[in-house]
C-alpha cells in the first residue's frame, strides 16, 4: 500500500524484526563448524593456566616475592576481566565469526588491543612489576619499545599496516604469519599502554599532562585506518568476498577435515548485511570502542592527577605557620 509516496505495507519495525530473525537463524549455522572451531579448547586451557598462575602468585606464593603485599580486589577484578575478555574475543565464537563478518573482526581487534591490555596492566601488583622488571632482558625491551614516541608510532603504524588490504588478505590466509602478526600487535599494544599505566617510579616517562596528550595522539593516529574502512565505497578485503581466499582463511580456525566435509563455498551464508555496509560498520565499531576506552583512561589519569594535586596542596598548607593557614 502506497500513501504519500511511501510504502507502508511492511513497516520498518517489521523489516528490522525480520533482519534480527535472520541473524538468529544464521548464527545457528555456526555449529556446523564444530566445538573446536567455536570454543578453541586449547586456548581456553592456556587462559585458565594464566589465571591459575596469577592467583597462585598473588596468593600462597606471594611470600616468595620481596615487599609483596595483599592484592586489592580491584586489581584482581581488572586482571580477571582482561583474561576473560581475551578468551571471549579470541577463543570464543567471535573469533570464528570474525573470519566471516568483518564487523565482528573489528570488534575482536578493538577489544583485544585496546580494552584488554590496560586491564591486564592495572591488574598486576607493584611488587610483581618489580620482579618482572628485575631481569636485564625485560629492562632492555621496555626501555626501548615502551618509549612513548616509539610505542605510539609502532602500535598505530602496525595496526594501520595490518589493515592495508594487500597485507590483511595475505596474513589472513597464512597459518604462520597470522599468529605471529597477532602476537606482535598484542606486544605493541602492551608497550603502547605501558607509559600510561605502569606504577613504577623509574619508568614514569610522562607527566600527567603529557599522558593526556599521549592518549589524544593515539586517537588521532588510529583515525586514518578507521577512516579508510569507514569511507570505502567498495569491498576492500578479498577474504570476505572471494570464495577461494575465504576458504583459505577459514583453515586457520576450522579443522581441515571439518571444512572439507561442509558444503560451503563462501561467507555469504552468514552475511546479514551488504559487504560494504559490514565493512563500514566494522570501522565505526573500532572507533567507538577506541573512544570509550581512551576517554575512560583519560578520565582515570585526570582524576588521579587532580587528587594528587589536592593532597599536595594540603601538605603544603600544613607546613605553613598556623596563623597563615586558612580555616
Predicted region positions:
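Short, strongly hydrophobic alpha-helical membrane anchors
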Residues: 1-3, 10, 16-36
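Serine residues within intrinsically disordered or low-complexity segments
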Residues: 6-12, 255-259
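Hydrophobic residues within membrane-embedded alpha helices
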Residues: 3-6, 111
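Alpha-helical membrane segments of multi-pass proteins
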Residues: 23-327
